[in-house]
A protein has these predicted regions:
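C-terminal "cap" of GNAT-fold acetyltransferases
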Residues: 112-124
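Conserved donor-binding loop and adjoining core beta-sheet/short helix segment
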Residues: 29-64, 121
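Acyl-donor binding region in acyl/amide transferases
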Residues: 51-103, 110-112
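A structural boundary/capping signal
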Residues: 1-8, 36-38, 90, 95-99, ...
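Short amphipathic alpha-helix that is part of the acyltransferase structural core
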Residues: 1-23
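Long, contiguous secondary-structure blocks with strong helical propensity
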Residues: 2, 45, 82, 86, ...
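N-terminal low-complexity, intrinsically disordered segments
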Residues: 24-28
């Protein structure tokens, strides 16, 4: 699937209109304010929000096994990125549990507007 198809499928599955999401992401990507990673039928948007920190948004159309593979790849790329911490809002607590099971230190966020934080070093 193309990234726009993945994001659209994820938004619709969650009862959200995909148009505003796609418009905002297009602007962020065009302005080089964010990067997009894709693995299988999952997309991760990484938006720098400060020195050494970024905000993450995950969109997926993968089944559980495909999502685990994608998360492994995304974690590997984040480990090599030089980021100290990443933040996000998880609508699905199962995804946070998957990330923890893959060895990432995930804690409650210390920044307003986010409900989780993962810190460096992202454990091997």
């Amino acid at each position: 699937m193309k990234p726009t198809e993945i994001i659209t499928a994820d938004a619709k599955r969650n009862g959200v209109n995909p148009a505003p999401i796609l418009n905002k992401l297009g602007r962020l990507l065009n302005n080089k304010e964010a990067i997009m990673l894709q693995s299988g039928n999952s997309v991760l948007i990484v938006q720098k929000i400060g020195k050494g920190i970024a905000e993450l948004h995950l969109y997926t159309a993968d089944n559980q096994m495909g999502l685990v593979r994608a998360l492994r790849e995304f974690i590997k790329k984040i480990r090599s990125s030089g980021l100290d911490a990443v933040y996000g809002n998880a609508d699905n607590p199962q995804i946070i549990e998957m990330v923890k099971a893959l060895g990432v230190n995930v804690i409650d966020s210390d920044l307003p507007g986010y409900n989780w934080k993962a810190t460096y070093p992202f454990k091997e």
